[in-house]
């Protein structure tokens, strides 16, 4: 392993030791739809340890994406609290929440959301540039992560010149470049063919172990979910722990 890869093994978000990187207690979320109050989340609870891989499964429309948005501070719960690295995420000011989110959380989506006019390198460097890191330093860090996900040789290519699997690898690199404690992934393999999905999922599992980064992964694929440490099913707004899948 080269020096740049070695630097990735020290997550910067672990500034204060805490048993859980992410906790949610009593999370409820309701929407008004057609004049009716629709409850999507009802007293949902979960906790995620450092380096743990948690799969969230459930029927389409059950509220899995809404749950991730609440966990990531992108949406406010109607009730309940989310804590990140032991800090009361949902009680912080918007500025404090944004700062903690940028330091402790990463995001991966089904559609990569890469900026088409920028190279893979500059897409991955973007979160660091937002932190006001110099262009040179940000690109150096970004290249190290791209090499880690097997995309160093494609760093100068734009998203339109990459395959679906390659674009998702770049998206994973972008999520990891800030060395987050936890990555929230919403159907990260849902837009990929079976073989490519398996490769990308294996990459996330490997990075979770080697970097001690937690992953909360929403997926419809029971086989992929079974390779995580734990599975929780969202049903009627409530999270239920699933029994371990036999290996």
From Swiss-Prot:
It is found in: Cell inner membrane. One of its GO terms (molecular function) is transmembrane transporter activity. It is an enzyme of class 7 (translocase). InterPro entries: AAA+_ATPase, ABC_transporter-like_ATP-bd, ABC_transporter-like_CS, ABC_transpr_LolD-like, LolD_lipo_ATP-bd, MacB-like_ATP-bd, P-loop_NTPase. PROSITE patterns: ABC_TRANSPORTER_1, ABC_TRANSPORTER_2, LOLD. It is a peripheral membrane protein. Keywords: ATP-binding, Cell inner membrane, Cell membrane, Membrane, Nucleotide-binding, Translocase, Transport. This is Lipoprotein-releasing system ATP-binding protein LolD. It comes from Paraburkholderia xenovorans (strain LB400).
